């Protein structure tokens, strides 16, 4: 049947065209191209290999490939938790002139909450499917510490934090206003996302679907830290932050629509402004 043929052609496409596997220091290491761009987005790489997790126990080579993606993602986070896309090595790239703290290992440095959530989702599901906890080593612990620090900085309770981004461009959605800080927010417990999963700049910086993704991802991280690492203090930090963001979402992320009643806004700023829309890529309101 044509549908079977379509599946046979499409399902292995990521393996055939974007996955680059090697071992580094004796451990699996997988660099995943995002489409035709020779760079690895944390979000896209996590989504591209996601369908293969269910088959990991049936194919040892596939399992090693997945382990390599997860290990590579942890390394990337520890290079720079604010970056969304990375090079295969310190080779520089097209966006080195962006006005932000660029490094040669980075392809792009757009701060997007979901970039730190997709690796947690992938690692958690891999662990649940395979029972392999070897990935949760010191690199993992450091990645979690960096994720927590970054999320807390971008709650902006103690100033605007270290992240700024500007690009010389004719496209407004590829840069941030307000001297690279983006629109002001009221620090109510939500996390700022300077850019959306589409890589477009947010209008109001509390991106609601991505804050929900942060809540679920932090809870998954806490479970791993408790069960595997026995690191209850770090797990509690994850749980506490998840609860704080979840509470803030209930209070600030909804809008009383005159026709549809209570709905979630796509973006808010904590001052009472709401952006009612949705955007391509996941997480989105529709995808929730």
Language model region names:
Residues 15-28, 91-99, 184-196:
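Active-site-adjacent bridging/hinge elements
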Residues 38-66, 70-173:
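Aromatic-rich carbohydrate-recognition surfaces in CAZymes
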Residues 10-17, 44, 51, 115-122, ...:
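Amphipathic, well-ordered alpha-helical segments in soluble domains
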Residues 10, 51, 68, 72, ...:
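Generic, well-ordered alpha-helical scaffold segments in large soluble proteins
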Residues 7-43:
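Active-site-flanking structural segment that lines cofactor/substrate pockets
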Residues 55-60, 126-142, 201-205, 220-240:
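Inter-helical turn/loop segments and adjacent helix faces that build the functional surface
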């Amino acid at each position: 049947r044509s549908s079977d043929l379509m599946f046979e052609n499409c399902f292995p496409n990521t393996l055939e065209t974007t996955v680059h596997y090697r071992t580094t220091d004796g451990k699996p290491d997988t660099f995943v191209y995002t489409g035709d761009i020779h760079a690895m987005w944390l979000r896209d790489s996590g989504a591209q290999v996601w369908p293969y997790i269910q088959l990991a126990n049936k194919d040892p080579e596939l399992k090693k490939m997945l382990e390599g993606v997860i290990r590579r993602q942890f390394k990337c986070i520890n290079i720079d938790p604010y970056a969304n896309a990375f090079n295969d090595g310190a080779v520089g790239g097209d966006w080195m002139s962006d006005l932000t703290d660029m490094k040669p290992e980075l392809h792009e440095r757009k701060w997007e909450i979901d970039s730190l959530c997709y690796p947690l989702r992938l690692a958690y599901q891999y662990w649940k499917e395979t029972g392999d906890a070897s990935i949760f080593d010191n690199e993992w612990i450091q990645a979690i510490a960096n994720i927590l620090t970054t999320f807390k900085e971008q709650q902006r309770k103690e100033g605007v934090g270290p992240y700024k981004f500007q690009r010389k461009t004719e496209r407004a959605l590829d840069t941030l206003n307000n001297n690279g800080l983006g629109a002001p927010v009221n620090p109510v417990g939500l996390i700022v996302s300077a850019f959306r999963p589409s890589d477009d700049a947010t209008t109001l910086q509390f991106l609601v679907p991505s804050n929900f993704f942060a809540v679920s991802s932090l809870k998954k991280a806490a479970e791993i830290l408790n069960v595997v690492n026995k690191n209850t203090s770090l797990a509690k930090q994850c749980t506490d932050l998840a609860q704080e963001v979840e509470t803030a979402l209930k209070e600030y992320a909804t809008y009383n629509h005159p026709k549809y009643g209570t709905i979630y806004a796509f973006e808010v700023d904590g001052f009472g402004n709401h952006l009612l829309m949705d955007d391509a890529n996941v997480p989105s309101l529709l995808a929730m």
